[in-house]
């Protein structure tokens, strides 16, 4: 019965819901991936990966504005953000081996901002009461719909010969199933359970994984300044989250003392 329900098409209920799905499809797929992938043509993978990791900061601010989550953002949160931005700056301006390119860095920051809107829309979609599979399918529908016009603005050519290459087929399979379908399903499920801000916290691990992968797969060189920048980014973002928790704990203890 559950399989029949999830395989059935999602019914139309209201234009408000459809606009939410469309907004998620636009921000989560074409805008985010185009900005990130174009950034990769200007900057190194490790550089882009670290800068995009500031998405949780934008998500917290966006969620505060549109979802009223987590209450008021405390000063400690912004202190952590400043530390993270210092780390990002060190990575972006760390010398010749990182191939400084402001265009790539700006596009990476833009991708992080776009993702924050997708995270908030994911939370709104989760409140519609549909299954995660239904939500992901409808989001993908609009994402592909918005992606088609982009083909006319880029040098896109059909080359069926490429599909005879095992590496090419593997890359498409990995990006389509692993990095897209599975990731979007698990992301939407996590947002439904944890919320937009808490789920975005796990993006903190992205620069570490990206930096390691760029060394192993792409043979990129990571300088000492880059390593320092990564530490500051992760430390600053984690500090802002921990400080928020400490603030809530202190507030709770203060309330208990007043009651006593």
Describe the residue ranges of each PLM region:
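Hydrophobic transmembrane alpha-helices of multi-pass small-molecule transport proteins
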Residues: 62, 73-94, 204, 225-244
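Membrane-interface helix-cap regions at the ends of transmembrane helices
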Residues: 1-13, 65, 85-99, 142-166, ...
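C-terminal transmembrane-helix exit sites in multi-pass transporters
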Residues: 55-79, 208-227
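Intrinsic disorder in cytosolic terminal tails and internal cytosolic loops
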Residues: 244-260
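Helix-helix packing/entry segments at the starts of transmembrane helices
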Residues: 29, 45-54, 121-144, 176-216
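Hydrophobic alpha-helical transmembrane segments of multi-pass integral membrane proteins
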Residues: 1-2, 23, 58, 77-86, ...
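Specific transmembrane alpha-helical segments of multi-pass solute transporters/efflux pumps
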Residues: 3-52, 83-84, 90, 176-194
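Residues that mark transmembrane-helix kinks and helix-interface sites
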Residues: 33-37, 57-60, 92, 115-120, ...
């Amino acid at each position: 019965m559950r399989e029949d329900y999830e395989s059935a098409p999602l019914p139309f209920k209201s234009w408000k819901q459809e606009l939410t799905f469309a907004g998620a499809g636009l921000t989560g797929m074409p805008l985010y991936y185009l900005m990130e992938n174009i950034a990769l043509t200007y900057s190194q993978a490790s550089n882009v990966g670290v800068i995009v990791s500031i998405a949780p900061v934008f998500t917290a601010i966006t969620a505060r504005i549109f979802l009223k989550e987590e209450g008021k953002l405390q000063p400690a949160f912004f202190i952590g953000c400043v530390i993270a931005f210092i780390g990002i700056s060190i990575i972006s301006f760390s010398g010749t081996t990182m191939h400084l390119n402001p265009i790539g860095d700006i596009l990476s920051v833009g991708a992080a901002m776009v993702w924050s809107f997708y995270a908030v829309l994911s939370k709104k979609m989760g409140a519609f009461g549909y299954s995660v599979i239904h939500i992901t399918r409808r989001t993908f529908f609009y994402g592909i719909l918005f992606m088609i016009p982009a083909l006319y603005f880029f040098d896109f050519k059909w080359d069926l010969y490429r599909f005879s290459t095992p590496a090419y087929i593997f890359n498409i399979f990995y990006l389509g199933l692993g990095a897209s379908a599975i990731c979007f399903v698990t992301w939407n499920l996590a947002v439904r359970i944890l919320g937009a801000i808490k789920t975005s916290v796990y993006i903190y691990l992205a620069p570490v994984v990206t930096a390691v992968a760029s060394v192993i797969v792409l043979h990129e060189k990571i300088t000492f300044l880059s390593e320092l920048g990564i530490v500051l980014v992760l430390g600053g973002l984690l500090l802002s989250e921990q400080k928020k928790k400490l603030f809530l704990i202190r507030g709770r203890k203060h309330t208990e003392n007043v009651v006593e």
